């Protein structure tokens, strides 16, 4: 049985939402409960366009979950994966993956979970040619760097640039 960790609690304050984003699905991804997400996913059926649609920030639903609901990100993303979401999807504007977002937000649980998934690109670079490891390095997040190294994330580019 899944147990919800808590509310989104992102401390970001109010955000402006496009009219096309004022739908139940994206609200649930952003701040809804795990149970709400479980209730709506069976209604996707053969039409999974919401899973792959980008919002005005260039984010798909999995990116929205990772940025806005750190406490429940892993459980929500697992539910979305069962519905057919692409775990390797990148944000349009930044090219960030879930691992980049986890490194940027200090979400160790999400980073650890992501690194254990099959078929993920642990060395993906975003549009600024930054890896998740490099983001952790820039933020001086030694705990994230250690976690990523433990999962075999390559940090050779950082080392060769004298940044380790």
Curated annotation (Swiss-Prot):
Keyword Cytoplasm among record annotations: no
ANK repeats mapped onto the chain: 57-89, 94-124, 128-157
Pfam families per UniProt: Ank_2 (PF12796)
Keyword annotations: ANK repeat, Host-virus interaction, Inhibition of host NF-kappa-B by virus, Repeat
Record GO biological process: symbiont-mediated suppression of host NF-kappaB cascade
Family matches, as InterPro entries: Ankyrin_rpt, Ankyrin_rpt-contain_sf
Source superkingdom: Viruses
PROSITE patterns: ANK_REP_REGION
Cystines in this chain: none
Summary of the function given for this chain in its UniProt record: Suppresses the host immune response through NF-kappa-B inactivation. Possesses ankyrin repeat domains required for NF-kappa-B binding but lacks the regulatory regions required for dissociation from NF-kappa-B and degradation. Therefore, prevents host NF-kappa-B release and subsequent activation.
Family from the record: Belongs to the polydnaviridae I-Kappa-B-like protein family.
Protein name listed in UniProt: I-Kappa-B like protein F1
Species assigned in the record: Microplitis demolitor bracovirus (isolate Webb) (MdBV)
Gene field: F2
């Amino acid at each position: 049985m899944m147990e919800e960790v808590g509310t989104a609690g992102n401390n970001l304050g109010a955000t402006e939402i496009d009219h096309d984003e004022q739908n139940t699905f994206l609200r649930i991804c952003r701040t809804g409960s795990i149970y709400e997400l479980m209730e709506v996913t069976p209604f996707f059926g053969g039409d999974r366009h919401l899973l792959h649609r980008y919002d005005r920030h260039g984010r798909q639903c999995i990116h929205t979950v990772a940025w806005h609901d750190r406490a429940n990100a892993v459980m929500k993303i697992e539910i979305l994966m069962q519905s057919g979401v692409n775990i390797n999807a990148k944000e349009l504007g930044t090219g960030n993956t879930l691992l980049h977002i986890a490194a940027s937000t200090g979400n160790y649980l999400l980073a650890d979970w992501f690194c254990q998934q099959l078929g993920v690109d642990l060395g993906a670079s975003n549009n600024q040619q930054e890896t998740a490891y490099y983001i952790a390095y820039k933020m001086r997040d030694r705990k994230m760097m250690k976690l990523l190294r433990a999962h075999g994330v390559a940090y050779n580019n950082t080392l060769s640039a004298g940044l380790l």
